[in-house]
Amino acid sequence: MFGQLLGDPNKRRLKNYYPIVSEINILEEDISVLSDEELRGSTNEFRQRLEKAENSDKQLKILDELLPNAFAVVREASKRVLGMRHFDVQLIGGMVLHEGQIAEMKTGEGKTLVSTLPSYLNALTGKGVHVVTVNDYLAKRDAEWMGQVHRFLGLEVGLIQQDMNPRERKKNYQCDITYATNSELGFDYLRDNMAADKAEIVQRDFQFCVIDEVDSILIDEARTPLIISGQVERPQEKYQKAAEVVMKLQRASELGKDGIDPEGDYEVDEKQRSCVLTDDGFAKTEELLEVKDLFDPKDPWAHYVTNALKAKELFTKDVNYIVRNGEAVIVDEFTGRVMPGRRWSDGQHQAIEAKENLAIQPETQTLASITYQNFFLLYPRLSGMTGTAKTEEVEFDKTYKLKTSVIPTNKKVSREDWVDQVFKTENAKWRAVAKETSLINKQGRPILVGTTSVEKSELLSTLLAEENIPHNLLNAKPENVERESEIVAQAGRKGAVTIATNMAGRGTDIILGGNSEYMAKLKIKQVLSSRLVKPEDRHNPPVPLQRDKASGFKSLEVKAEAKTSNQSSSLNNLFPVILSDKTDNELGQLAAKLVKEWGDRALTLGELEDYIATAAEKTPTKDENILAIRRAIHSIKTEYEVITNNEEKLVTEAGGLHVIGTERHESRRVDNQLRGRAGRQGDFGSTRFFLSLEDNLLRIFGGDRVAGLMNAFRVEEDMPIESGMLTRSLEGAQKKVETYYYDIRKQVFEYDEVMNNQRKAVYSERRRVLKGQELKSQVISYGEKTMGEIVDAYINEELPPEEWELDKLVGKVQEFIYLLNDLKSSELIGLDTNQLKVFLQEQMRNAYDLKEAQLEETHPGIMREAEKFFMLQQLDTLWREHLQSMDSLRESVGLRGYGQKDPLIEYKNEGYDMFLEMMINFRRNVIYSMFMFQPTTKKVES
């Protein structure tokens, strides 16, 4: 009722933007007649106006005033360079982002293009803008694609990639707009705060950030902190032995209740992702290991056994990790991508290596860590966009203070969401998926099937191979990841079938009929790489990987040098048509010309890709080679478009893209993302979810109610079940999971908030030391505090002065400052506490000046170097130890809940005390090190 009275708050918010949209549209006419030079000149005009701002508040006010003109300029540049004009709703999206909100825009509504508006406007300040995406491929694509608009307007565009060295990173962070992934940004921040020298710092101060797929980064990944770690030696044979022992233990069929152990050696709680030994299990494990106590501090085993049990029960090969080149590589549970170089901490990765009989790598110790929540809160202004944010609106507001605005679609959504089909068993479900795929495939419609793991995608792939349905597989396996963009470029073609794990190709639109421009670039790359790219750097030509009945994966090898007409017909699955002789000859001539210019097989693949990306842009250039590649791309695209445009028409008439979901995800939001793949920009399309009562979601969170339903449904295995009660159970289960994970994220955030305040204090102290700001006065202040603390520790004011232990006090001072060895306790008689502090502080300052004079005589400038060295060394060592102590505290406070104490409050209080203790030790250690420091002089040998 209140909603009807007050109206939709989202609509009310959007209403404020329409007058500005009208203003931008009016400006369009005047701006469209400007020359390229004049359009580019707008950037300098805007910057000159911003120079007048005295502070960031004034700057923001001027940015708001510039917005209509700046957006109109970006729209015109985009038309000229990309051939894409921002719709009115995209302008609204840009305003929402500039204001530091989350813009919910449906799939295919051009979120990537929207980001050019606020990023250009905020880059005018010269303080840098970060555009964040979920993976390296998307960051590179957007920097090349959308970066054209910014470069055309005179801005510098940077890109951060996983394999870049610090020098390249620094250069790219200095650009006006930098494209990067969330993990690269986070790790660079942590590395900067471990730098030994100011020159090693790569990032500058944060200003404005736009996060693409904001829900994936700020919600899904918020449970996992970013950790930089160092190696710790632990006995490797213990991992191996524990892995062997747990294989002899029996899992309990159910969880224990009311403190009574179930039958079995250990119980597994999949919901909490934990494994616990029963009393019988403890006894049996101790017997098998031939030890008396698993918790014996001199020979601890409990940690190894628990991790081995988790590796056995909760970490599944080809779901949570894959084995590649003798290593266990993590698979990201949200994107389905492999994460090389990442490892589970706390000995879990070693337990998995032992389980798989792989070489066990050393265990690691945390050197620095931060959660994404606290990392992104470091930005003074933060914004984000996604196709699905409304379900998490409350969390965005509570955790990040971000409001969510739903942007209307440019065209009406024409997608049909068909009713779910639920089967009793998983086998029946997969047979039904294969059947529907076959049926829709015969209609000529493209199909996208979303699966939740590598294992499931390969199971379905086998079923489709048995039905002789050609298809592409997009999952975390390395041979597929490299072909991700090729697969997605073809996913909208007539009769195409694509199986994707957790929609790894997120961020790439599926265009009905196929993406002719992308396929043209691919064709150029295939032809030129054989003549221009070094053999060792060359990948196999891009060929569809298809299931073959007899041999699993069959990669159809094609010689890139071969004439197109002689190529295997399978290439028609990749490219829409065999090129005409005219275009084919042009490509041969182009290759010969470029070999003369750039050398025979002299380029790396990356260099060739950069040339092709530049040629694909519409940015003006005088480089003849780039222009020649540009003409070739245009010729190929024109021939391909004849087919893709016709296929688009046929596919649209047949009903558009059909999306099949094979399991409800733990979050409704991820289901909506998969559905949103169909029906982009008003296209026709349909979606259907196939589920089984054995699916993880229902099994773990659906509880006993679903078990009862399974028995109640005495129906054939292949008969789909449709029931209101079942649908409600499903939605109830999803809400339960969402709440459960929200609570976990909230807890992670609350606990890391304690660490965050400490981290900020340590990092700002560290940054000040690196910059070398007034180090001497800083060290002297440490010394003064230390002298005060010694007086407080040795003088009891409740006793008469004659009973004060002045000898011990002087002894302690001399431990720290050997230069005060002549100090006598008799000199302190008659002084009160404050006078003692003032006297000793004065003595310490004199001693420090004396120390400096002695050292500077033989080693000029060494004192400042020593101050910097010891301050960094002590801070890093103590912070590292403090992180370990805080981890241990976090584990131990959980038990205090049983004593009616709030674990979080206990953690805050004790953590604060531990931090104060750490800072006291830091000050004392620096003072001690500075006075004890004696530089050695190297003897010059004749």
Swiss-Prot record:
The keyword Cell membrane applies. One of its GO terms (cellular component) is cytosol. Its EC number is 7.4.2.8. InterPro entries: Helicase_ATP-bd (IPR014001), P-loop_NTPase (IPR027417), SecA (IPR000185), SecA_CS (IPR020937), SecA_DEAD (IPR011115), SecA_motor_DEAD (IPR014018), SecA_preprotein_X-link_dom (IPR011130), SecA_SF2_C (IPR044722). It is found in: Cell inner membrane; Cellular thylakoid membrane; Cytoplasm. The keyword Nucleotide-binding applies. Its main location: membrane. Part of the Sec protein translocase complex. Interacts with the SecYEG preprotein conducting channel. Has a central role in coupling the hydrolysis of ATP to the transfer of proteins into and across the cell membrane, serving as an ATP-driven molecular motor driving the stepwise translocation of polypeptide chains across the membrane. Probably participates in protein translocation into and across both the cytoplasmic and thylakoid membranes in cyanobacterial cells. NCBIfam families: secA (TIGR00963). This is Protein translocase subunit SecA. It comes from Prochlorococcus marinus (strain NATL2A).
